[in-house]
Amino acid sequence: YLPPSQAMMGGEGWLNPAQVKLLGDAVLRQCDADDGLVDGIVANVEGCRAKFNVNELRCAVGQTGDCLTHAQVRAVQAHHAEYLFDFSLANGVRSYPGRPLGGEGTPGSGPVGGWVSWLTGQEAPAWPATPRNSIGWVYGSGAMAHFIARDPNIDIRQYEPGRYAQRVRE
């Protein structure tokens, strides 16, 4: 959760709840029927990954409203992209899969919520984290500061896993 959340820092790449719905609706419009059933579920996740293009939601010059800015498109891409570590974990793994497409607009909160609950929050990621930030940011930033860096005063916005490779491997 941390690298994509860092892409939303300062608010430039952050998607508000209406923009998350816009994204979720676009994913469903393009991918829901791929399994032959229009049911609000993206069952063919890999097929959707191959065909969904978030750039289609990018705002035209001067456009605002039902579109995403360049920074927001990059943040969405960061959420879906595989994260590559510049070192190997203890088990030899060097990457973490990106989030699958589907479920972006799932309503609700807590463990059953979609992106607003887990990834974007009601406000852009802040440091220190606030209750209106996403669950992923609250948990992730706390874990990085207290478990990995072991420094409650670290500016998590500047966190880079490579600096803590030994701790991450433990």
Give the location of each predicted region.
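C-terminal His-loop and adjacent cap/lid subdomain of alpha/beta-hydrolase
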Residues: Y1-E170
